[in-house]
Amino acid sequence: MRDGDILKDKKILIVDDEPDILETLMELIDMCLIDTAPDFETAKKFLSKNTYDAAILDIMGVRGYDLLQITTQKDIPALMLTAHALSPEHLIKSIKEGAHSYVPKDKMVDIETFLSDLILAHEKGLKKHGRWFERLKPFFDKQFGPEWREADKDFWKDFDLKYMVTKEEVGDVI
């Protein structure tokens, strides 16, 4: 199944304080039914009235972590999309607080793929939804340096066990 097929008519909330980002995302996932919010209060109102298949949340400028808390309580899988909060610390915080994905705005052009992975994993009830990380690890290694996971070894060991599918597990499924 193609990413666009997975996303067709999915209800998505996009929250970002940059109008050009909202516009670009709407164009990239135009097969979805989209609500956009430029700030926390607007997003909070949408979340109180509507249900969503997923949310794309900026971190800075829109109180993204507060919105993440709301989406997590409502069982709406959230993809954190960031430029200013692009750091190992924010990546870890996003995961710990319930984000299903953490995507740099530099990789926004691939949002259809990341969002499809997220929604498919959520719909199937998959606990191991780390495909986004597999796709982005080379980017993170380049951005943060090859040893960036060493500072939080225990977190990343736990992350790998919880969210990454091993070769053996893939073999069991096939």
What are these regions (language model features)?
Residues D9:
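Phosphate-coordination loops involved in phosphoryl transfer and adenosine-cofactor binding
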Residues P19, T36-A54, V62:
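Acidic, metal-coordinating helix/loop segments flanking the phosphotransfer/catalytic sites
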Residues L120-I174:
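C-terminal output/effector regions of signal-responsive regulators
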Residues I14-D17:
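Acidic di-acidic motifs
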Residues T24-I29, F46, I70, K93:
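Alpha-helical interaction/dimerization surfaces of two-component signaling modules
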Residues P19-T36:
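Two-component/phosphorelay signaling modules centered on CheY-like receiver
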Residues I56, M60, L68-T71, D75-P88:
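A short, hydrophobic beta-strand element within the central beta-sheet of small alpha/beta folds
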Residues D66, Q73, A85-T113, D117:
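Alpha4 helix (beta4-alpha4-beta5 surface) of REC/receiver domains from two-component response regulators
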